[in-house]
UniProtKB/Swiss-Prot annotation:
Coiled coil (residue ranges): none
Quaternary structure (record): Homooligomer. Both monomeric and oligomeric forms interact with RNA. Interacts with protein M. Interacts with NSP3; this interaction serves to tether the genome to the newly translated replicase-transcriptase complex at a very early stage of infection.
One of the Pfam families matching this protein, by short name: CoV_nucleocap
Modified residues (Phosphoserine): 9, 253, 255
HAMAP family cross-referenced by the UniProt entry: ALPHA_CORONA_NCAP
Name of the gene this protein is made from: N
Region (Disordered): 1-29, 152-239, 331-353
Any one cellular-component term (Gene Ontology): host cell Golgi apparatus
Descriptive protein name: Nucleoprotein
Basic and acidic residues bias: start-end ranges: 201-234, 333-353
């Protein structure tokens, strides 16, 4: 494929043969997520016979990038040990992305139907795929949708998943309480027998009980769980604790581009997390100092805000913060910078003979000089 691409042309291909195949399609394991909701068909309908050539969803990319393919996802359910096939689903991906990211436009592939608007370019787009922490978008088209196509709408998956988890946790807690009560009853019987024997020997058991009770209270306060409680919360209200943050916010991508491998793997347990957090605006600053917009997106409301603020160039925290932006796209460069910083740090420790306050723990003031860095943060939920 030429690097510059060319304008779309359908002159060398028959509509009937766009993606038709005889097999059941590829496996659905580890398929990248589509930006859009899927399409299902009426029973007996063939997607490749009905799909218009310019059947590209609206809402993402420029005019040159309105090109891609619909990918078939086969589905089934096991019922009493037997496989029961479910209706196929078709998901849209832009050219150069998704499960067939390396395929050329109009390349004959199993379970793939190519589509493009007339003024698009036949070169790979840079639009990527949807992150795991983002909701899929409702399908909208400039062309007429075939009556046999059913456009799926977003389901409240988080709510149903939360209810399922809540029921499971409730059962587990009930079983745990039952076992605990049984064990406690046995322990109480043994304890009462021991206390009675000690009392006969003249031992002050009440004093020992008070001491043991205080010890238990201190122990329970030390082992209190500080892990953030994220159950039944929207994705945008969850808080990452110590550990991998991708399970809450997805892998690093163009829509979630902050954090190197160390920060993503350790969350707020990362070495420089406190200093990085100091560079982030407060809730009230975001709420009252941002530009907000909202629009309907299927059965949900999509909210976008843009927030601009300044950081001083000569503050060490600013340099650390900037290094985390788009770090996922340059892993080798980031690793080299980290090694250099570590070497410089060891060199300074050997040379210096006195303890110097750590500049990275200084607090910001509201007044900065003219040597500043401007950061514009746009978040869409």
């Amino acid at each position: 494929m030429a690097s510059q691409g060319q304008r779309v042309s359908w002159g060398d291909e028959s509509t009937k043969r766009r993606g038709r195949s005889n097999s059941r399609g590829r496996k659905n394991n580890d398929i990248p997520l589509s930006f859009f909701n899927p399409i299902t068909l009426e029973q007996g309908s063939k997607f490749w016979d009905l799909c218009p050539r310019d059947f590209v969803p609206k809402g993402i990319g420029n005019k040159d990038q309105q090109i891609g393919y619909w990918n078939r996802q086969t589905r089934y359910r096991m019922v009493k040990g037997r496989r029961k096939n479910l209706p196929e689903k078709w998901f849209f991906y832009y050219l150069g992305t998704g499960p067939h990211a390396d395929a050329k436009f109009k390349q004959k592939l199993d379970g793939v139907v190519w589509v493009a608007r007339g003024d698009s370019m036949t070169k790979p787009t840079t639009l990527g795929t949807r992150g795991t922490n983002n909701e899929s978008k409702a399908l909208k088209f400039d062309v007429k949708v075939p009556s046999e196509f059913h456009l799926e709408v977003n389901q409240l998956r988080d709510n149903s998943r939360s209810r399922s988890q809540s029921r499971s946790q409730s059962r587990n807690r009930s079983q745990s309480r039952g076992r605990q009560l049984s064990n406690n009853k046995k322990d109480d019987n043994v304890e009462q027998a021991v206390l009675a024997a000690l009392k006969k020997l003249g031992v002050d058991t009440e004093k020992q009980q008070r001491s043991r009770s205080k010890s238990k209270e201190r122990s329970s306060s030390k082992t209190r769980d500080t892990t953030p409680k994220n159950e039944n919360k929207h994705t945008w209200k969850r808080t990452a604790g110590k550990g991998d943050v991708t399970k809450f916010y997805g892998a690093r991508s163009s829509s979630a581009n902050f954090g190197d491998s160390d920060l993503v793997a350790n969350g707020n347990g990362a070495k420089h997390y406190p200093q990085l957090a100091e560079c982030v605006p407060s809730v009230s600053s975001i709420l009252f100092g941002s530009h907000w917009t909202a629009k309907e997106d299927g059965d949900q409301i999509e909210v976008t805000f843009t927030h601009k603020y300044h950081l001083p160039k000569d503050d060490p925290k600013t340099g650390q913060f900037l290094q985390q932006i788009n770090a996922y796209a340059r892993p080798s460069e980031v690793a080299k910078e980290q090694r250099q910083r570590k070497a410089r740090s060891k060199s300074v420790e050997r040379v210096e003979q006195e303890v110097v306050p750590d500049a990275l723990t200084e607090n910001y003031t509201d007044v900065f000089d003219d040597t500043q860095v401007e950061i514009i943060d746009e978040v869409t939920n």
